[in-house]
Protein backbone atom coordinates (compact mmCIF):
# COMPACT_ATOMS: atom_id res chain seq x y z
CA UNK A 1 0.00 0.00 0.00
CA UNK A 2 2.69 2.51 1.00
CA UNK A 3 5.03 1.58 -1.84
CA UNK A 4 2.24 1.89 -4.42
CA UNK A 5 1.25 5.36 -3.27
CA UNK A 6 4.85 6.57 -3.34
CA UNK A 7 5.38 5.08 -6.80
CA UNK A 8 2.26 6.92 -7.98
CA UNK A 9 3.69 10.24 -6.79
CA UNK A 10 6.94 9.49 -8.62
CA UNK A 11 5.02 8.74 -11.81
CA UNK A 12 3.12 12.03 -11.57
CA UNK A 13 6.23 14.13 -10.88
CA UNK A 14 8.23 15.71 -13.67
CA UNK A 15 11.84 14.72 -14.20
CA UNK A 16 12.94 18.34 -13.74
CA UNK A 17 11.39 18.62 -10.28
CA UNK A 18 13.71 19.87 -7.54
CA UNK A 19 14.84 16.61 -5.82
CA UNK A 20 14.60 18.21 -2.37
CA UNK A 21 11.00 19.18 -3.08
CA UNK A 22 10.25 15.70 -4.44
CA UNK A 23 11.46 14.02 -1.25
CA UNK A 24 9.25 16.30 0.81
CA UNK A 25 6.28 15.57 -1.44
CA UNK A 26 6.83 11.84 -0.94
CA UNK A 27 6.26 12.34 2.78
CA UNK A 28 2.68 13.54 2.29
CA UNK A 29 1.00 10.10 2.06
CA UNK A 30 3.07 8.97 5.06
CA UNK A 31 1.82 12.01 6.97
CA UNK A 32 -1.75 11.08 6.07
CA UNK A 33 -1.31 7.55 7.40
CA UNK A 34 0.17 8.72 10.70
CA UNK A 35 -2.60 11.29 11.13
CA UNK A 36 -5.23 8.62 10.47
CA UNK A 37 -3.59 6.46 13.13
CA UNK A 38 -3.45 9.30 15.68
CA UNK A 39 -6.99 10.58 15.27
CA UNK A 40 -8.66 7.18 15.04
CA UNK A 41 -6.93 6.00 18.23
CA UNK A 42 -8.73 6.60 21.56
CA UNK A 43 -5.49 7.32 23.41
CA UNK A 44 -4.13 9.90 20.96
CA UNK A 45 -7.11 11.66 19.40
CA UNK A 46 -6.85 14.42 22.04
CA UNK A 47 -3.44 15.40 20.60
CA UNK A 48 -3.46 18.96 19.25
CA UNK A 49 -2.19 19.08 15.66
CA UNK A 50 0.04 22.11 15.08
CA UNK A 51 2.91 23.34 12.91
CA UNK A 52 3.37 23.75 9.18
CA UNK A 53 1.82 20.43 8.17
CA UNK A 54 -1.31 21.35 10.13
CA UNK A 55 -1.45 24.69 8.32
CA UNK A 56 -1.06 22.98 4.95
CA UNK A 57 -3.55 20.16 5.43
CA UNK A 58 -6.29 22.01 7.35
CA UNK A 59 -5.91 25.67 6.40
CA UNK A 60 -4.40 25.70 2.89
CA UNK A 61 -0.84 26.94 3.50
CA UNK A 62 0.70 27.02 -0.01
CA UNK A 63 3.93 25.16 0.71
CA UNK A 64 4.96 21.64 1.62
CA UNK A 65 5.90 20.69 5.16
CA UNK A 66 7.99 17.74 6.33
CA UNK A 67 7.21 17.01 10.00
CA UNK A 68 4.16 16.26 12.12
CA UNK A 69 3.87 18.35 15.27
CA UNK A 70 1.55 17.59 18.17
CA UNK A 71 1.01 19.32 21.48
CA UNK A 72 -0.42 17.18 24.26
CA UNK A 73 -2.52 18.43 27.18
CA UNK A 74 -0.66 16.72 30.01
CA UNK A 75 2.43 14.55 29.69
CA UNK A 76 2.83 12.56 26.45
CA UNK A 77 3.53 8.82 26.61
CA UNK A 78 5.95 8.62 23.69
CA UNK A 79 6.92 4.98 24.30
CA UNK A 80 3.31 3.82 23.95
CA UNK A 81 2.84 6.05 20.90
CA UNK A 82 5.82 4.46 19.16
CA UNK A 83 4.75 0.90 20.00
CA UNK A 84 1.17 1.46 18.84
CA UNK A 85 2.25 3.22 15.65
CA UNK A 86 4.69 0.43 14.75
CA UNK A 87 1.90 -2.10 15.20
CA UNK A 88 -0.46 -0.01 13.04
CA UNK A 89 2.05 0.30 10.19
CA UNK A 90 2.91 -3.40 10.33
CA UNK A 91 -0.57 -4.87 10.76
CA UNK A 92 -2.99 -2.35 9.22
CA UNK A 93 -0.79 -0.97 6.44
CA UNK A 94 1.03 -4.28 5.93
CA UNK A 95 4.40 -2.52 5.76
CA UNK A 96 7.05 -4.27 7.84
CA UNK A 97 10.24 -2.42 6.94
CA UNK A 98 9.70 0.76 8.97
CA UNK A 99 12.03 1.38 11.90
CA UNK A 100 11.89 4.15 14.49
CA UNK A 101 14.32 6.37 16.37
CA UNK A 102 13.51 8.39 19.47
CA UNK A 103 15.55 11.50 20.28
CA UNK A 104 17.51 11.85 23.49
CA UNK A 105 14.95 14.38 24.73
CA UNK A 106 12.22 11.80 24.19
CA UNK A 107 9.88 14.17 22.33
CA UNK A 108 10.95 13.56 18.73
CA UNK A 109 10.19 10.27 16.96
CA UNK A 110 11.69 9.63 13.53
CA UNK A 111 10.02 7.06 11.30
CA UNK A 112 12.46 5.48 8.85
CA UNK A 113 11.10 4.11 5.55
CA UNK A 114 13.80 2.44 3.37
CA UNK A 115 12.00 3.16 0.08
CA UNK A 116 14.16 5.58 -1.90
CA UNK A 117 16.30 2.97 -3.66
CA UNK A 118 13.33 1.20 -5.22
CA UNK A 119 11.93 4.60 -6.24
CA UNK A 120 15.12 5.34 -8.19
CA UNK A 121 16.32 8.15 -5.93
CA UNK A 122 19.59 6.57 -4.78
CA UNK A 123 22.33 7.34 -7.30
CA UNK A 124 25.52 6.96 -5.25
CA UNK A 125 26.80 5.69 -1.93
CA UNK A 126 26.36 9.22 -0.57
CA UNK A 127 22.58 9.07 -1.09
CA UNK A 128 20.50 7.71 1.76
CA UNK A 129 17.97 5.01 0.89
CA UNK A 130 15.72 6.18 3.73
CA UNK A 131 12.74 8.51 3.66
CA UNK A 132 12.38 10.05 7.11
CA UNK A 133 9.24 11.37 8.76
CA UNK A 134 9.64 13.08 12.12
CA UNK A 135 6.86 13.37 14.70
CA UNK A 136 7.41 15.91 17.47
CA UNK A 137 5.23 15.30 20.53
CA UNK A 138 5.43 17.92 23.27
CA UNK A 139 3.45 18.95 26.32
CA UNK A 140 1.20 21.94 25.54
CA UNK A 141 3.26 24.86 26.90
CA UNK A 142 0.84 27.56 28.07
CA UNK A 143 -2.72 26.35 28.64
CA UNK A 144 -3.77 29.33 26.51
CA UNK A 145 -5.19 28.19 23.19
CA UNK A 146 -8.24 27.66 21.05
CA UNK A 147 -8.92 24.31 19.41
CA UNK A 148 -11.35 22.91 16.89
CA UNK A 149 -12.16 19.56 15.31
CA UNK A 150 -12.02 19.49 11.51
CA UNK A 151 -12.55 16.75 8.92
CA UNK A 152 -9.49 15.75 6.91
CA UNK A 153 -9.93 13.82 3.68
CA UNK A 154 -7.10 11.78 2.19
CA UNK A 155 -6.89 9.55 -0.86
CA UNK A 156 -8.07 6.64 1.28
CA UNK A 157 -10.45 7.92 3.93
CA UNK A 158 -11.79 10.80 6.02
CA UNK A 159 -11.22 11.31 9.73
CA UNK A 160 -11.51 14.12 12.26
CA UNK A 161 -8.49 16.04 13.49
CA UNK A 162 -8.22 18.05 16.70
CA UNK A 163 -6.05 21.07 15.98
CA UNK A 164 -5.30 24.56 17.17
CA UNK A 165 -7.49 27.23 15.61
CA UNK A 166 -6.02 29.93 13.36
CA UNK A 167 -5.55 32.65 16.03
CA UNK A 168 -3.61 30.15 18.17
CA UNK A 169 -1.46 29.02 15.23
CA UNK A 170 -0.92 32.66 14.21
CA UNK A 171 0.24 33.45 17.73
CA UNK A 172 2.54 30.43 17.87
CA UNK A 173 4.06 31.37 14.51
CA UNK A 174 4.75 34.96 15.54
CA UNK A 175 6.36 33.72 18.75
CA UNK A 176 8.44 31.19 16.78
CA UNK A 177 9.61 33.87 14.35
CA UNK A 178 10.93 35.91 17.26
CA UNK A 179 11.96 33.21 19.69
CA UNK A 180 13.04 30.12 17.76
CA UNK A 181 16.71 29.25 18.29
CA UNK A 182 17.49 27.79 14.86
CA UNK A 183 20.38 28.30 12.48
CA UNK A 184 21.08 26.49 9.22
CA UNK A 185 24.83 25.92 9.00
CA UNK A 186 27.68 28.02 10.37
CA UNK A 187 27.11 30.91 7.93
CA UNK A 188 23.73 31.83 9.43
CA UNK A 189 24.33 34.32 12.22
CA UNK A 190 20.72 35.35 12.98
CA UNK A 191 18.45 32.57 14.29
CA UNK A 192 15.32 32.03 12.20
CA UNK A 193 13.64 29.52 9.91
CA UNK A 194 12.76 30.54 6.37
CA UNK A 195 9.58 28.53 6.85
CA UNK A 196 8.56 30.81 9.72
CA UNK A 197 9.09 33.82 7.45
CA UNK A 198 6.88 32.32 4.73
CA UNK A 199 4.17 31.26 7.16
CA UNK A 200 4.11 34.58 8.99
CA UNK A 201 3.72 36.45 5.71
CA UNK A 202 0.84 34.11 4.79
CA UNK A 203 -0.87 34.73 8.14
CA UNK A 204 -0.48 38.48 7.80
CA UNK A 205 -1.92 38.40 4.29
CA UNK A 206 -4.98 36.50 5.55
CA UNK A 207 -5.37 38.90 8.48
CA UNK A 208 -5.09 41.96 6.26
CA UNK A 209 -7.66 40.54 3.84
CA UNK A 210 -10.02 40.19 6.83
CA UNK A 211 -9.37 43.81 7.89
CA UNK A 212 -7.40 42.49 10.88
CA UNK A 213 -10.33 40.61 12.37
CA UNK A 214 -7.92 37.66 12.41
CA UNK A 215 -5.36 38.39 15.12
CA UNK A 216 -2.75 36.28 16.87
CA UNK A 217 -3.98 34.93 20.19
CA UNK A 218 -2.12 37.65 22.06
CA UNK A 219 -2.20 36.15 25.59
CA UNK A 220 -0.48 33.07 24.15
CA UNK A 221 2.12 35.17 22.29
CA UNK A 222 2.95 37.15 25.42
CA UNK A 223 3.19 33.97 27.52
CA UNK A 224 5.47 32.21 25.02
CA UNK A 225 7.80 35.21 24.70
CA UNK A 226 7.63 36.46 28.28
CA UNK A 227 6.48 39.82 26.89
CA UNK A 228 3.90 42.26 28.21
CA UNK A 229 2.87 44.33 25.19
CA UNK A 230 1.55 43.25 21.78
CA UNK A 231 2.67 46.42 19.98
CA UNK A 232 6.25 45.99 21.17
CA UNK A 233 6.20 42.37 19.97
CA UNK A 234 5.13 43.50 16.50
CA UNK A 235 7.82 46.18 16.42
CA UNK A 236 10.46 43.59 17.35
CA UNK A 237 9.19 41.36 14.55
CA UNK A 238 9.35 44.24 12.05
CA UNK A 239 12.94 45.00 13.04
CA UNK A 240 13.90 41.36 12.58
CA UNK A 241 12.06 41.14 9.25
CA UNK A 242 14.00 44.12 7.90
CA UNK A 243 17.35 42.47 8.66
CA UNK A 244 16.69 38.96 7.29
CA UNK A 245 19.24 37.38 4.97
CA UNK A 246 17.08 36.50 1.96
CA UNK A 247 19.53 33.88 0.65
CA UNK A 248 19.29 32.01 3.94
CA UNK A 249 15.49 32.27 3.82
CA UNK A 250 15.52 30.74 0.33
CA UNK A 251 17.92 27.95 1.34
CA UNK A 252 15.61 26.86 4.16
CA UNK A 253 12.51 27.01 1.94
CA UNK A 254 13.94 25.15 -1.09
CA UNK A 255 12.60 21.67 -0.10
CA UNK A 256 9.10 23.12 0.36
CA UNK A 257 8.54 25.37 -2.71
CA UNK A 258 8.05 23.72 -6.08
CA UNK A 259 9.91 26.05 -8.45
CA UNK A 260 13.00 28.23 -8.24
CA UNK A 261 11.01 31.04 -9.87
CA UNK A 262 8.47 31.05 -7.04
CA UNK A 263 11.24 30.85 -4.45
CA UNK A 264 13.15 33.74 -6.02
CA UNK A 265 10.00 35.88 -6.24
CA UNK A 266 9.29 35.28 -2.57
CA UNK A 267 12.80 35.97 -1.30
CA UNK A 268 13.17 39.05 -3.52
CA UNK A 269 10.10 40.69 -2.00
CA UNK A 270 10.57 39.83 1.68
CA UNK A 271 12.16 43.11 2.72
CA UNK A 272 9.48 45.17 1.03
CA UNK A 273 6.42 43.16 2.01
CA UNK A 274 6.92 41.63 5.48
CA UNK A 275 7.93 44.82 7.37
CA UNK A 276 5.03 46.65 5.70
CA UNK A 277 2.60 43.93 6.77
CA UNK A 278 3.85 44.13 10.34
CA UNK A 279 3.60 47.93 10.28
CA UNK A 280 -0.04 47.56 9.18
CA UNK A 281 -0.66 45.14 12.05
CA UNK A 282 0.88 47.62 14.49
CA UNK A 283 -1.39 50.36 13.13
CA UNK A 284 -4.44 48.11 13.55
CA UNK A 285 -3.47 47.37 17.16
CA UNK A 286 -2.98 51.05 17.97
CA UNK A 287 -6.29 51.94 16.34
CA UNK A 288 -8.01 49.27 18.41
CA UNK A 289 -6.38 50.59 21.59
CA UNK A 290 -7.50 54.13 20.79
CA UNK A 291 -11.04 52.87 20.20
CA UNK A 292 -11.08 51.15 23.58
CA UNK A 293 -10.03 54.38 25.32
CA UNK A 294 -12.79 56.51 23.79
Enumerate the predicted regions with their spans.
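Structured mid-to-C-terminal alpha-helical surface segments
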Residues: 1-47, 58-61, 73-294
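Glycine-rich beta-strand-to-loop/alpha-helix junction loops that act as flexible
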Residues: 50-53
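Anion-coordinating catalytic cores for phosphoryl-, nucleotidyl-, and glycosidic chemistry
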Residues: 65
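Structural signature of FAD isoalloxazine-binding scaffolds in flavoprotein oxidoreductases
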Residues: 70
